[in-house]
């Protein structure tokens, strides 16, 4: 069965007494068992049946099984948010006295997790230029637990060579962990490029309309102890599982993701090319542009698709604020990959709590505006940009 069909019709939905076409929302916490033996088997993991909705729920499990089939993963775990997926994956890999190798370019909350939260538990992070493979090789040592990266960094839009990083990771018998939120897992196969574990904020593409918060960890089975820790410790002990209502909504989003994403990519390409000729804009950064330094690598890795996020640079922070304040159709909101086109000033929002020195080290500039492209008629959005400039 091909992916477009599998996203809608799957063999995993159990029969429903009423013939429901959509997977029902099982809004229940506990489950009744036929007898004590079955109950014991479920709780001890000898059979895979729902026992408590903090660790398994039929609606959530349906979404997990569908994504597992779409990706070819060994196991998919649905989490309460994208950050829950990232923190859950990393906590399941690290130990006191160990370290993570990652990029200087990443989402602000992920940076805080790696540089503020994990160090409190004795875990350090080596931040380096992941596009410089010699620097990565020097950063990895005997205490490194994993290499972690975003496949397209937010908001710097840097792309690293996944296959090359995977080779370095596997030489040291550690996993390559990738936040693949920027390109839907339906569009490219990260595992074929060497990624061992994917983390995804399903708040973005799967939600679409900014109506549900979730995340997933996609595990390709190369590190069995990771799978045990994620299930036994993150779900049982920390309670970061997705809720059934969110799973229901995100399953609906997954059904039409293919159509939405194709239109958003077309819209992004149209908008980017329309803006490149405007004199008020100093530069447009999009990995889908042929003159972008990461274009060839992105095309090779992501199946000739570059996502729906780009940035523009204006002359100053003040010019950025004036532009954002004058927008009428484009929304001032920090979400990504929404049905609506969104614009933010990253330096003063998602990196607003960072010092000037930290932002400079991460190449987060005061002159940059991040754009996430939606489903509107792009002629209207271009006109909105023109009047705001």
Named regions from a protein language model:
Residues 47, 212, 247, 305-309, ...:
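Short, solvent-exposed beta-strand edge segments and adjacent coil->beta transition regions
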Residues 269-328, 332-340, 354-360:
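Conserved small-domain helix->loop->beta segment predominantly found in fold-type I
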Residues 12-14, 27-33, 204, 256, ...:
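Glycine-rich beta-alpha junction loops
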Residues 1-26, 217:
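Short conserved active-site loop signatures built around small residues
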Residues 7-13, 75-280, 285:
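Conserved PLP-enzyme active-site core in the AAT-like
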Residues 249-259, 307-315, 370-374:
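Short, well-ordered beta-strand elements within core beta-sheets of diverse protein domains
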Residues 30, 35-84, 109-116:
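Conserved N-terminal alpha-helix of the aminotransferase class I/II PLP-enzyme fold
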Residues 115, 124, 138, 318, ...:
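PLP-dependent enzyme catalytic core of the Aspartate aminotransferase-like
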